[in-house]
Swiss-Prot record:
It holds the Pfam family HSCB_C. Residues 3-75 form the J domain. One of its GO terms (biological process) is protein complex oligomerization. The lineage of its organism: Bacteria, Pseudomonadati, Pseudomonadota, Gammaproteobacteria, Pasteurellales. The keyword RNA-binding does not apply. It comes from Haemophilus influenzae (strain ATCC 51907 / DSM 11121 / KW20 / Rd). This is Co-chaperone protein HscB homolog. One of its GO terms (cellular component) is iron-sulfur cluster transfer complex. Keywords: Chaperone. Transmembrane segments: none annotated.
Amino acid sequence: MFNPFQIFDLPVDFQLDEKVLNARYLKLQKALHPDNFVSSNALDQRVAMQKSTEVNDALKTLKDPILRAEAIIALNTGEQLDLEQKSTQDVAFLMQQLQWREQLEEVERQQDERALNAFAKEIKQETQSLLTALFESLKSQQWARASQYCDKLRFTHKLSEEIERVEERIFELD
């Protein structure tokens, strides 16, 4: 099973020291740089390229809190998360999603910058609250609950991206 923490010789923990992660990334990338393998055979070059790809994938996973949490869950449960088969069972959150989408559509329709800023702040606060709850769930090894928080965070992340697109469209019209 892919273990991004092992690649960087880090403990499996949601809280990371970004400076240590970045330093180890640079060290690994320097060691795997293609110039180091110019005189090597094709197999060694291919292996170095594969390892470099693994390092990049691991970095991407560890820098993204949702992917990092999902990696921790997978490492502890032995199960990879299949996003296509997952569906949110939290009816209240599904209703909240619909309400937020309608709210964003209304803000965009009205071209209301102040309402958009307030909405963006609300979603940012919700995301922060979900990250805190995710951290607590991981700490207490409640893997199913942590997975649910990942789902919710994935939604708020997408919604934040949509808010940014709406913001760009509103400011283009000004």
